[in-house]
Amino acid sequence: MVAISLSFVLPPPPPRYTVPVAYAAGAANGMAVPVVETNNILSHPEGGCPLQVGEGTYELKDDLHLATPPPHPSEAPIINPNPLATVPTPPTSGVKVSLVCVSPRSKTPSFISKQIVTAPPFGDGNPALVPAPVKDGLKRRKPKNNIIKSSSSFVSRVITHEAATKRLSERSPEGLFAFANINRAFQWLDLSSKQKEEPLAKILFTKAHMLCHDINEVTKSPSHIDMVMGSSAGDIIWYEPISQKYARINKNGVVSNSPVTHIKWIPGSENLFMASHANGQLVVYDKEKEDALFTPEIQDQSAEALKASSRQPLQVLKSVNSRNQKTNPVALWKLANQRISHFAFSPDQRHLAVVLEDGSLRVMDYLKEEVLDIFRSYYGGLICVCWSPDGKYIVTGGQDDLLTIWSFPERKIVARCQGHNSWVSAVAFDPWQCDERTYRFGSVGDDCRLLLWDFSVGMLHRPKVHQASARQRTSMVAGSSQYGNRHRADSAGNRMRSDSQRTANTYESCDQAVRHPVEPRARTALLPPIMSKVVGTDPICWLGFQEDCIMTSSLEGHIRTWDRPREGINDKYNDQSSSPAVSASAAGSGSVSGLAESTMGSL
């Protein structure tokens, strides 16, 4: 009987996928996996996988399948046939894509162009962070090392296209560049080229996998692109693809020896970027500073002080206001002992939304190095997060197969979105289909599905059974939002002494984060998708919206592109007076819910 009861306690083994997961483990069914590198494959499916929505049909334009590189010869395969074994495998993230247009687009979403940023730069007021004057005027600094001629053991080899210079000189500056990782390879692609399957450059790393990457929108130009990428080893690469120069940051984990889970340039900054690590740390780096062995700047090392600081939602191990800014890190914060899954900067360039594997969403004022609010998932960890273009809403996705919409001004949950059958891996807003009243966002997940969602506040209704108690609870949360919005009393002068000088009593008094209880599902509005579609046979890892298309990438390297409906339909849809989505929201939730239900029913 004991054996029978244990069989119900043990969780089922995780799903096993043929190429990437077996590649990470080095074996499948106890046998070494023969992975042979091939060229990228570009296909144009005819009439396959259209996306039907109110404004028209999104047609699948092409499917670019990235080649999976073979393991490095020095990488011994780990034979592990037991699916329940606890031996850790190298972290993987699937294929993530960074897109950049080096020339300003002719059109920008009107919803985005109305936003006005008034926040000061990160680190403003600290003279130690004032950048040194540039000798060459407006000329951008580049990394020092040539990655093609590199003798580093971290980089295995670099393959460049034989006609790369010619292709770069002849291409339109309005075309899209794409940067994508697949296992230990990192590819630079020109999506505007007829030979888009032929990378301009491919970097093969020795053992580390690139898990995340980002492009600096401030410094980009036709002759310069600043990119940072984080690896499974914790090392970070600053890469300039046009000159093929690079620099290695956090070398051998000298600052943080944990895999980089997400990385983003700090909005408006030319040099500073933020990286989250699997050990629960958020680190701000300067691409032009050298590394040094990191020691927390905490003067009071007593057991009482350390115990008090560990209970805080944010431990400032090095403040951005520290005068010690000769080397990296610029700032280092500890949020938890568990993995940070993802983070996103708000459009006002002041707030930061962070999701963790412990199931928490933490909203920070990162300029003040403070956690304002802590929300919890319904079940399991949170995986992805994004802000609406106007900064009013935050959307998260996680292991509970749900998406959750949070109102940032009101500091409360707005709705839960049910439609995925597995973990939600990525979420993003479509700024070209958003206006002041209606929002469009999309999500992808391990169920191989792409879902699109429309919502407005007027179309969301709580369940009638709990409306009375819900109204009472809303007033309570609204009161707490005023508490969450309050201004802190500490001045810039006091903070210049560094948060690391706080004592135990100071830690007890400064924990001002509002911890919101979990809202029961029975009291929460439920939003169905307007479109749900299985778009492949392997989990989807990334989702991006462009002016003329929707793009996804998958675990096994498929980058798919859907063209938006033709211009006439889109122009009509973007007109607020004739928008089907706005009309539906004005009419109430019935028509929108009915549309979503009929869409789901036909799948």
Curated annotation (Swiss-Prot):
List, alphabetically, the SMART domains matched: WD40
Q: Which GO terms describe its cellular component?
A: cell division site; cell tip; nucleus
What InterPro entries does the record tag this protein with? Answer: WD40/YVTN_repeat-like_dom_sf, WD40_repeat_dom_sf, WD40_rpt, WD_repeat_creC_regulators
- Ranges of the WD repeats in the UniProt entry: 255-295, 335-376, 377-416, 419-463, 535-572
Q: Which GO terms describe its biological process?
A: carbon catabolite repression of transcription
The record ties this protein, via Pfam families, to:
WD40 (PF00400)
Ligase recorded as keyword: no
Q: Which UniProt keywords apply?
A: Repeat, Transcription, Transcription regulation, Ubl conjugation pathway, WD repeat
Question: Which residue ranges have biased composition labelled Polar residues?
Answer: 470-484
What does this protein do, in the record's words? Component of the regulatory network controlling carbon source utilization through ubiquitination and deubiquitination involving creA, creB, creC, creD and acrB. Required to prevent the proteolysis of the CreB deubiquitinating enzyme in the absence of carbon catabolite repression. CreB deubiquitinating enzyme stabilized in a complex with the CreC leads to the expression of genes such as those in the proline and quinate pathways.
Family, per entry: Belongs to the WD repeat creC family.
Q: Know the name of this protein?
A: Probable catabolite repression protein creC
What species does this protein belong to?
Neosartorya fischeri (strain ATCC 1020 / DSM 3700 / CBS 544.65 / FGSC A1164 / JCM 1740 / NRRL 181 / WB 181) (Aspergillus fischerianus)
